[in-house]
């Protein structure tokens, strides 16, 4: 046990040098960026007896490969993490049945191509007890649209106006066909900024304290139904799969989300619980189209043809070869056929002017260098990277590999060759969000700097088209165009393994890691 605790401390130190700076004000816990999660004095008094009995219940402890770095709801991907941690909610949410529902919106309708109206329920509350009405939704969603450019991908800049306390007017810059899907996008969470600049949210849990990228300590939100039946939750970050397994074996964590294939097998062999799900995520490579050897389309084609994706599936012990940009259980998933042709790949490199010499290709006196880059919070990608490096060496590449934190920062900098990346590409059940994010010209997450009039036109048509069958056809065409132009490299449609204790044997993860901590976790 002592050895394990030492391992855990070391793991945490490696993950981050961030420290918790917590303060108390009127018995309301806050973090260093002033995220407030509050209860009134009366509520505390009313729950005194319940709290006494609940104090005897051990917290649910979850081990993950990542933990949020901050709690600013308008900061890049932070809102996604807050929802995954059970602190925030998007306006609409995807259920286990794949259907969208909302605790905040009663109904909505399209007024004209760029205008919608929505009627709010005004029954859900923030964690401080304030009602979520039309004005509250307008305030937070407008703030997101102004401060987080990732929220502008699907419909351009969107403005929200509260006509009264139950009526919301929504105006979009580009046409939008599925308002509920748009409001399910992970950027669009419900929050309120208080006069002291702190935030309150609406999820089933509130933040008691946290250490950036290391640990989140959560308590049930008293203003969320069923709070008295929920235990406290602690989320711990592990970068090392062995340390996470040690923690799980020792009974120190109730859930390991996710575990590598090897660890999953060892846990199963010990007759312990492992849940396997279709991740919904896609594993793919991001090419740098602006500089380096990958500017040459023939070099990108050679990589696409020269790698053996089946070897990735074998090493990951599950998943499928990708057929496009979406998980294959979606009706708009691509129909791209990926195959290996090593001889054709070598011929393309020959045509590009790279001549093999001493097992490395050379052109104009320079070797064919490529650096593969990935990040530690998705261990599967490291496995793929190691295999891919060997495959590319066989083609004559001089390959370097690196694992970095802050992968999006590296991607935005443009200082990379080929990034191995993971993304849930349809968390809303619609293809428009991710296709616009990654492939529309000049979008924030278009890390490749891909520009295609044909793609932009397809995405414009997708925004205007109401017919479901035609929308599916447009999404498939967009994925075929990606396979042709190769701004990214389709790799794997993965499965994930999650280890759970007997206490959580009934827990069923879904939709990737978007709702790890949810209202059913007890």
Identify the residue ranges that each predicted region occupies.
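Aromatic- and charge-enriched surface segment that lines or borders ligand/interaction sites
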Residues: 106-148
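Ligand-site clamp/hinge motif
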Residues: 221-266, 398
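Surface-exposed binding/hinge segments that line
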Residues: 109, 113, 150-193
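N-terminal lobe/hinge region of extracytoplasmic solute-binding protein
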Residues: 63-111, 200, 512-514
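Structural transition elements
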Residues: 321-357, 376-382
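Ligand/substrate-recognition segments at binding pockets and active sites
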Residues: 355-425, 496
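Gly/Pro-rich hinge or "lid" segments in bacterial periplasmic/extracellular proteins
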Residues: 78, 176-228, 232, 242-243, ...
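Detector for C-terminal structural segments
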Residues: 306-332, 380-387, 410-522
């Amino acid at each position: 046990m002592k050895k394990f605790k030492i391992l855990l401390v070391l793991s945490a130190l490696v993950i981050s040098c961030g420290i918790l700076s917590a303060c108390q004000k009127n018995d309301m816990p806050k973090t260093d960026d002033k995220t407030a999660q509050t209860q009134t004095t009366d509520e505390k008094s009313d729950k005194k007896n319940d709290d006494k009995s609940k104090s005897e219940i051990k917290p649910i402890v979850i081990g993950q490969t990542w933990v949020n770095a901050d709690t600013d709801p308008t900061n890049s991907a932070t809102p996604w993490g807050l929802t995954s941690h059970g602190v925030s909610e998007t306006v609409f949410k995807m259920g286990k049945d794949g259907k969208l529902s909302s605790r905040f919106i009663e109904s909505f309708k399209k007024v004209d191509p760029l205008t919608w109206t929505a009627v709010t329920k005004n029954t859900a509350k923030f964690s401080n007890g304030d009602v979520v009405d039309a004005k509250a939704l307008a305030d937070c969603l407008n703030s997101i649209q102004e401060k987080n450019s990732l929220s502008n991908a699907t419909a351009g800049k969107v403005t929200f106006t509260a006509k009264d306390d139950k009526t919301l007017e929504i105006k979009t810059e580009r046409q939008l066909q599925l308002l509920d899907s748009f409001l399910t996008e992970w950027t669009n969470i419900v929050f309120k900024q208080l006069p002291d600049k702190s935030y309150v949210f609406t999820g089933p849990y509130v933040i008691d304290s946290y250490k950036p990228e290391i640990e989140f300590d959560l308590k049930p939100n008293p203003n969320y139904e069923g709070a008295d039946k929920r235990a406290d939750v602690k989320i711990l970050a592990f970068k090392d799969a062995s340390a996470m397994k040690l923690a799980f074996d020792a009974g120190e964590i109730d859930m390991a989300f996710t575990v590598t294939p090897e660890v999953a097998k060892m846990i199963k062999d010990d007759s312990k619980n492992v849940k396997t799900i279709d991740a919904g995520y896609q594993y793919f490579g991001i090419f740098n189209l602006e500089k380096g050897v990958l500017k040459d389309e023939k070099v990108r084609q050679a990589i696409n043809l020269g790698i053996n994706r089946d070897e990735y599936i074998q090493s990951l012990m599950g998943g499928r070869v990708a057929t496009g940009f979406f998980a294959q259980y979606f009706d708009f998933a691509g129909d791209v056929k990926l195959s290996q042709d090593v001889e054709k790949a070598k011929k393309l490199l020959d045509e590009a002017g790279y001549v093999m010499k001493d097992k490395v290709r050379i052109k104009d006196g320079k070797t064919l260098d490529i650096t593969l880059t990935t990040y530690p919070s998705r261990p599967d990608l490291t496995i793929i990277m190691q295999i891919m490096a060997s495959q590319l060496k066989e083609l004559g590449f001089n390959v370097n590999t690196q694992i970095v934190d802050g992968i999006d920062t590296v991607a935005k900098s443009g200082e990379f060759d080929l990034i191995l990346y993971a993304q849930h590409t349809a968390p809303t059940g619609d293809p428009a969000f991710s296709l616009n994010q990654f492939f529309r010209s000049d979008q924030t997450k278009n890390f490749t700097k891909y520009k295609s009039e044909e793609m932009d036109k397809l995405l414009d048509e997708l925004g205007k088209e109401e017919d479901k069958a035609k929308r599916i056809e447009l999404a498939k065409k967009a994925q075929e165009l990606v396979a042709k132009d190769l701004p990214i490299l389709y790799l794997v449609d993965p499965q994930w393994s999650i280890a759970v204790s007997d206490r959580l044997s009934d827990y069923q993860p879904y939709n990737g890691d978007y709702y790890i901590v949810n209202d059913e976790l007890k």
